[in-house]
A protein has these predicted regions:
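Nucleotide-activated donor-binding/catalytic signature segment of Leloir-type glycosyltransferases, i.e.
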Residues: 229-245
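Short hydrophobic beta-strand element within catalytic cores of glycosyltransferases
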Residues: 36-37, 282-285, 295
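Aromatic "clamp/platform" in nucleotide-sugar-dependent glycosyltransferases that forms part
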Residues: 246, 265
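Conserved acidic donor-binding segment of nucleotide-sugar-dependent glycosyltransferases
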Residues: 297-309, 317-322
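A short helix/loop element that forms part of the nucleotide-sugar donor recognition site in Leloir-type
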Residues: 163-178, 333
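A conserved, positively charged/aromatic
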Residues: 98, 104-133
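A conserved mid-protein helix/loop that constitutes part of the nucleotide-sugar donor-binding site
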Residues: 13-24, 183, 187-209, 223-230, ...
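A short, active-site helix/loop in glycosyltransferases that binds the activated sugar's phosphate group
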Residues: 127-152, 158-160
């Protein structure tokens, strides 16, 4: 297959990670793939480093420029379909009337209702197939008026690496200045209100009153960073919390941790949680949004509500129960290997492509 993939986001978040995994996986399986992306965006740079052709759209008038670029690419190259990774790319495709030439597929990763204004509805009508990352997101599309036959579910996936060695753990902890006898919880997520990192900061005084050796690493950046740092100071936990900012080599974070905590109040499928489970980390998570499709409480991860007290109780359970940590570590990794690997995600994406092309040709 010949696929044009489009993503106009400038920042690197979970959706862009999935785009990179998809593009690389498609190429490894013999498919021809190219990317249309914002100039000098994190995704454009990483995909280019992977040896895949990238067409970079100017940052000025991004969507209009991308619309023209998409028209030109489709006229010059024999693409069979266009996979849009986020809403800006959909706008560009719609402006360029790409849907009149090729089938459009749109990835959908969050359960917000679709916008009801006339322009938004016109854009959504141009989509041949919505690719929802979970049952929860698929239901939100149906609730917004999208017919079920226009929706396919492809769970997001993560790479499965060998478990860390003791030497890798020790090296990663030295990077963050964590002692061997300290118990390190961590979270990887953008700093916005709905990600809920404040619940972990609020849990920390309760946990450290009994276990002063506990520390917390909050990897990421965003609008709530200053607020979280202020809360940390207010609760007297400054020395116990690391704020390293955005970490490109995120494997170094997972390698350093003893356990992972994911306090999101509104989430798609939670690839950061999947990656932590794949790394063999015993995990605690809410079940908001689609997280309930990943977290099987007491088996693959501890399920709690989004508040500091519940996280504190679960954190203390993990600290005090080595057998529980071992069971969650093994079951969580096994769950990701079987259901949420990058390989599964790519194969299921290919099945959707084939189904769309088959039905388009029949039509």
């Amino acid at each position: 297959m010949r696929v044009l993939y489009a993503d106009l986001e400038r920042e690197w978040r979970g959706g862009q990670s999935q785009a990179l995994l998809t593009l690389v996986g498609l190429r490894e399986r013999g498919h021809e793939v190219e990317l249309l992306a914002a100039r000098d965006s994190a995704l454009a740079n990483r995909v280019s480093e992977a040896g895949i052709t990238v067409h970079q759209a100017s940052q000025f008038g991004l969507r209009a420029w991308a619309a023209g670029a998409m028209r030109s690419l489709i006229a010059r190259r024999r693409f069979e379909l266009v996979h849009l990774n986020e809403p800006h790319a959909l706008t560009a495709a719609w402006l360029g009337r790409t849907h009149t030439r090729l089938p459009l597929l749109l990835s959908r990763r969050i359960g917000f209702p679709l916008q009801k204004n006339a322009v938004s509805q016109a854009r959504y009508r141009a989509v041949e197939r919505f690719i929802a990352n979970s049952k929860d997101v698929a239901q939100s599309l149906i609730d917004s008026g999208i017919a079920a036959e226009r929706i396919s579910i492809v769970n997001e996936g993560v790479e499965i690496f060998p478990l860390r060695t003791p030497e890798q753990r020790s090296s990663a902890r030295k990077r963050w200045g964590v002692r061997e006898n300290e118990f390190l919880f961590g979270c990887v997520s953008v700093f916005v209100p709905e990600k809920g990192q404040r619940h972990l900061v609020e849990a920390l005084p309760l946990v450290r009153a009994l276990h002063p050796e506990v520390r917390l690493l909050l990897a990421g950046d965003g609008a709530c960073r200053a607020e979280l740092q202020a809360l940390t100071r207010h609760l007297g936990q400054t020395e116990a919390v690391f704020f390293p900012g955005f970490v490109k080599d995120i494997a170094q974070v997972y390698a350093a941790l003893d356990a992972f905590a994911f306090p999101s109040e509104f989430e798609g499928l939670g690839t950061a949680l999947q990656a932590a489970m794949a790394a063999g980390l015993p995990s605690i998570s809410t079940t908001r949004g689609a997280l309930g499709e990943v977290v099987d409480g007491e088996r693959t991860a501890l399920a709690v509500g989004p508040n500091g007290k519940e996280f504190a109780v679960a954190m203390l359970r993990l600290i005090n129960d080595g057998a529980l940590r071992k069971n969650l570590s093994e079951a969580g990794r096994r769950e990701v290997e079987q259901r949420f690997s990058a390989g599964c995600m790519v194969e299921n994406t290919i099945h959707v492509y084939e189904d769309v092309l088959q039905k388009t040709r029949k039509g």
